[in-house]
């Protein structure tokens, strides 16, 4: 047994079916270990003879074998998992398509199961096929589509569109363009198209180019040069082995025979360095001149390449044909050594495929057995109970999501309405204040003209009723104020109407995912699950536009042939759920809604709201460069609500009619609010006037008290001995003058007799006042003087009008 391992001698293998090789080819066992032989006898390839018959013609096709080898190198397969890369650097191979586990036997089985109609999705590429599909043929086609298009959004139903687009742009494969469904083509033509797709990926896809540069050893096949007579070197033949089990391909390179009339040489000599492609020449007429001449070799290279043609001929297609070819060419030392190195590799590869197919067949048999077996009533009841629990859980989860969506939408609408109300309320007060100032100024001018004086006009001078706090100016502005009476949102009211039995206010406008359908209610009733929702949701959409108020509400349907809302931007009011034309919205509405955003200086546009376009809007649109974008998948639901943006991605929209209703609501409460404000202002004014009067009265009393104190302080002292004839009841006692400043002597009054206190200064003694000798005055003259003093005390003068006279003692 040979122990040499090369590119073809990978230490893995596959099983060999009984009768795959005749008795003359039993010599291969000498090159395989006994362990592998024992496992090959234990594991047999299922349907090996049937598959060999089906692919007999297809296996001789070079494109088919190339596709098999290419898929083995890019998917997780025997080649990528067991190939030893130590000699090329690294210890493992990272597959390009890690999510696909490829084997030739499994792939061919799935291909013919798809074509023979055993697959339930036969000829049905409209069914969405994902990476978890069981059919390997579908998964590989989907992966090729993603690699060709350069993104992962393509689907198998877009196969013809994307593939034909790339084939038309390629001159080498433009003849493969077809309008027939891919699965309806012949199996050989299908692999021709797949081969062309692989070639386009190799030329254009950068991801594959990087993978090829890092794993070049996978695409370097074992090859041996054949020593056949090539008639003077015009042909060169070689034999190389593909990763496919037992596939040997002969490569023949033909060259054009060099003749007298042919300008093509069998050898191509071109310089490697750029400096050898440039010639320097100097002009003898011009001194010190240098001219650079670049030699052109492109024509020679193109001619040489056109003189060479390469043909690929599949010599063996499976394990048995390879052993037969080996037995026939044992006389050739090169072929014998080449094949003997491949025998252990292919044997282990067949064992790998046999185990993989056996496990897959076992899983399929178990699945069919579980499906067809007779189940007990207890298990059936348990499954029904589990299904009921799952259905009930899904139902209540849907109700929770539905309720959460409604609450979230109502919250957004409530916030928007509150902001709009605040703006409308401020604008109403601004309009009212403007009219109030104008009316007040007008009345003031009229009063000036009537009175002919410059007396200012006071609001409080107008007569007002006690039960009505509004003044005449308020009443005049409320009745005929030009600015206040004009509507902020000028829009005509809608025509009240119904759409059959449906009221426009009863449309919930919920997305289809949150709508309750009759089928769901029937299914819940079958399982006996109680639900508070007894009626399905109405999924109709109502159209009524303020630009056409004469039209009654109508139902929007996808098949309605009308230009009223087809191919026109539509927007739905989030408050009344009526669909309207976007272009019919008053600019005042957009300006008002823009003022409620975080950046009021930015005016909202159509793309900021959930605007949709009904009907086919692709006729006037430019096509995208990406082929999968030219035919966008149609929306499953034709409801306008399902086409709009989610609530979190667009601004809340309130229509003109709803804002007009908000304005009317605010106008209804404006007069009561104004009365409250005026009553409060009147009360505040009365309080200010009362406080002012109290302050003035307090000040007057304080001044009166000060004058009384001053009057009492300047009254003369009365002594009983000096004025014996005066009444004691009207004369203050001497005790009242104990604290009087003795340095001050009031001036004598000619109208009354006042005592003058004299001072005598003695050294070392205190100053003691001495009463002078008062003249004798009659009782009749004293009484009028006392009455006059009492009258003066009863009518005190202003402090500024009183004159006090003090007589100071002379200074010695």
UniProtKB/Swiss-Prot annotation:
Q: Where in the cell is it found?
A: Nucleus
The biased composition feature labelled Low complexity covers 769-796
Subunit-structure text:
Component of the ISW1B complex, which at least consists of ISW1, IOC2 and IOC4.
- GO biological processes: chromatin remodeling; regulation of DNA-templated transcription; response to heat
- General function of this protein: Functions as a component of the ISW1B complex, which acts in remodeling the chromatin by catalyzing an ATP-dependent alteration in the structure of nucleosomal DNA. The ISW1B complex acts within coding regions to control the amount of RNA polymerase II released into productive elongation and to coordinate elongation with termination and pre-mRNA processing.
Query: Where's it mainly located?
Result: nucleus
Other notes: Present with 7520 molecules/cell in log phase SD medium.
Residue stretches of biased makeup (Basic and acidic residues): 683-704
This protein is called ISWI one complex protein 2
Query: In what ranges is there compositional bias, type Polar residues?
Result: 627-638
Q: State the coiled-coil residue ranges.
A: 673-714
Which keywords does this Swiss-Prot/TrEMBL entry list? Coiled coil, Nucleus, Transcription, Transcription regulation
Which residue intervals make up region (Disordered)? 1-21, 614-646, 679-704, 762-812
**What are the annotated GO cellular component locations?**
Isw1 complex; Isw1b complex
Q: Which gene encodes it?
A: IOC2
């Amino acid at each position: 047994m040979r122990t040499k391992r090369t590119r073809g001698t990978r230490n893995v293998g596959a099983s060999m079916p009984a009768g795959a090789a005749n008795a003359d080819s039993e010599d291969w066992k000498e090159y395989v270990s006994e362990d592998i032989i024992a496992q090959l006898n234990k594991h047999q390839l299922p349907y090996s003879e049937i598959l060999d018959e089906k692919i007999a013609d297809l296996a001789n096709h070079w494109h088919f074998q190339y596709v098999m080898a290419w898929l083995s190198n890019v998917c997780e397969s025997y080649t990528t998992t067991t190939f030893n890369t130590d000699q090329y650097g690294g210890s493992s191979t990272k597959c390009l398509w890690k999510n696909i586990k490829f084997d030739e036997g499994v792939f061919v089985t799935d291909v013919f199961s798809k074509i023979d109609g055993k697959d339930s999705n036969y000829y049905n590429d409209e069914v969405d096929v994902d990476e978890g599909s069981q059919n390997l043929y579908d998964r590989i086609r989907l992966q090729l589509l993603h690699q060709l298009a350069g993104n992962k959004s393509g689907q198998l139903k877009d196969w013809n569109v994307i593939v034909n687009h790339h084939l038309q742009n390629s001159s080498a494969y433009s003849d493969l363009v077809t309008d027939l469904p891919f699965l309806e083509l012949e199996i050989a033509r299908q692999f021709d198209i797949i081969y062309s797709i692989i070639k386009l990926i190799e030329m254009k896809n950068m991801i594959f180019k990087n993978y090829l540069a890092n794993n070049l050893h996978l695409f370097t096949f074992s090859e041996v040069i054949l020593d056949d007579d090539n008639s003077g070197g015009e042909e060169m033949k070689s034999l190389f082995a593909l990763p496919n089990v037992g596939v040997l391909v002969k490569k023949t390179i033909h060259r054009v025979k060099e003749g007298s009339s042919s300008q093509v040489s069998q050898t191509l000599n071109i310089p490697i360095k750029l400096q050898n492609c440039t010639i320097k020449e100097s002009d003898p007429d011009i001194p010190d001149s240098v001219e650079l001449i670049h030699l052109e070799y492109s024509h020679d290279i193109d001619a040489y390449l056109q003189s060479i043609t390469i043909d690929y001929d599949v010599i063996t297609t499976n394990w048995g044909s390879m052993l037969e070819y080996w037995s026939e060419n044992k006389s050739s030392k090169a072929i014998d050594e080449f094949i003997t190195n491949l025998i252990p590799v292919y044997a282990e590869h067949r064992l790998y495929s046999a185990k993989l197919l056996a496990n897959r067949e076992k899983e399929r048999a178990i699945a069919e057995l579980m499906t067809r077996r007779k189940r007990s009533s207890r298990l059936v009841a348990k499954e029904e109970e589990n299904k009921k629990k799952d259905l009930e859980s899904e139902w209540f989860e849907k109700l929770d999501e539905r309720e959460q969506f409604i609450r979230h939408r109502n919250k957004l609408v409530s916030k928007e309405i509150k902001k709009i109300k605040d703006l409308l309320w401020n604008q109403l007060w601004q309009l009212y204040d403007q009219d109030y100032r104008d009316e007040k100024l007008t009345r003031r001018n009229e009063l000036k003209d009537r009175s002919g004086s410059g007396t200012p006009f006071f609001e409080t001078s107008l007569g007002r009723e006690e039960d009505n706090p509004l003044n005449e100016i308020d009443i005049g502005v409320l009745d005929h104020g030009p600015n206040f009476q004009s509507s902020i949102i000028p829009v005509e009211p809608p025509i009240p109407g119904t759409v059959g039995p449906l009221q426009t206010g009863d449309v919930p406008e919920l997305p289809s995912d949150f709508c309750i359908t009759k089928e769901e209610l029937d299914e819940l009733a079958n399982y006996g699950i109680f639900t508070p929702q007894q009626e399905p949701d109405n999924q109709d959409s109502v159209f009524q536009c303020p630009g056409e108020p004469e039209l009654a509400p109508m139902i929007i349907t996808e098949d309605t042939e009308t230009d009223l809302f087809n191919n026109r931007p539509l927007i739905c009011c989030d408050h009344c759920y009526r669909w309207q034309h976007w272009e019919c919205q008053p600019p005042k509405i957009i300006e008002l809604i823009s003022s409620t955003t975080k950046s009021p200086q930015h005016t909202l546009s159509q793309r900021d709201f959930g605007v949709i376009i009904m009907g086919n809007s692709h006729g006037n649109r430019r096509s995208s460069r990406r082929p999968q974008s030219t035919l966008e998948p149609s929306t499953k639901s034709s409801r306008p609500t399902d086409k709009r943006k989610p609530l979190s991605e667009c601004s809340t929209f309130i229509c003109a009619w709803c804002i007009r209703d908000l304005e009317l609501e605010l106008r209804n409460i404006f007069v009561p609010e104004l009365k409250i404000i005026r009553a409060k202002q009147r009360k505040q004014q009365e309080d200010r006037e009362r406080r002012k009067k109290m302050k003035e009265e307090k000040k007057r009393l304080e001044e009166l008290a000060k004058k009384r104190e001053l009057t009492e302080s300047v009254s003369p002292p009365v002594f009983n001995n000096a004025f014996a004839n005066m009444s004691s009841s009207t004369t203050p006692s001497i005790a009242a003058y104990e604290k009087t400043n003795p340095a001050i002597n009031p001036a004598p009054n000619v109208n009354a007799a006042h005592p003058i206190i004299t001072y005598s200064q003695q050294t070392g003694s205190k100053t003691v006042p001495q009463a002078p000798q008062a003249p004798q005055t009659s009782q009749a003259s004293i009484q009028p003087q006392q009455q006059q003093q009492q009258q003066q005390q009863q009518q005190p003068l202003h402090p500024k009008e009183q004159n006090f006279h003090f007589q100071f003692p002379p200074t010695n």
